[in-house]
Amino acid sequence: MRHRNHQHHLGRNRSHRRCLIANAMKALISHRRIETTLSKAKVLRQHADRCITWAKKETLAGRRRLIADLMVTFNSLTPKEARAARQLGDTSAYNDDRLLFQRLDRLVKDFKDRQGGYTRIVRIKKRRGDGAETCILEYLPVEEPEEEPAS
């Protein structure tokens, strides 16, 4: 029986949905915020929190899980070639594994003391063309500890 075995399909088949989630996750990790529809944001929030949790464990299995979920391709570009591609707006810049994992490690440092709930969804407006609810999915800002005034 398939009780409680529900998944949000987002109007796409399995391979298209997997690529959509992976590309949106790469953009979210790179920019810390993305604008998308509400239904996509609800699905991406689960994946974003799971990515941070796996990265925080710092195990080989966690690293491999991230590589598989984010569909990271290891390109053989030199740093100079990668920089030139990024300046030209080439999408292979998203597949730069070093850059992606550096930003992910920075997120892990920001959330090292937090036990989940790393993202938030802020609804903004309905899209003009089709009336879909749009929102901003973002990682929470880093809370700096407040210094107590010296008396």
Language model region names:
Residues 2-9, 19, 23-151:
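Structured, basic alpha/beta domains of bacterial-type, RNA-associated proteins
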